[in-house]
Amino acid sequence: MPNLVADFFRVHRDADVFVDFNDESDRELFVRICDFRDGLLPQVGDVVVAGCWGATPAKAHVIEVSDAWVRLRLLD
């Protein structure tokens, strides 16, 4: 089974996190730690580049980090 997140990062070298913009609610997204580029550990206050297949990447502010997920607020 192909690893879609790894494939995404091979193609989109500027993105920090793989998101589904269709899940956006009030300019916020919830993602899992494993959806971030390998080696990137998000911290509250970070600004990251969020990307999705077929969509323009967007800057996002990390506003909450838990053991299970990271909450992002889109800036663009």
PLM regions and their residue ranges:
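Short beta-strand-centered aromatic/proline hotspots
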Residues: T56-S66
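Short, basic/aromatic beta-hairpin or loop at an interaction surface
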Residues: R10-R32
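Short, well-ordered loop/turn sites that connect or cap secondary structure elements
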Residues: L40-Q43
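Short, solvent-exposed secondary-structure boundary/capping segments
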Residues: D67-D76
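Short, conserved secondary-structure segments in the cores of folded domains
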Residues: F36-D38
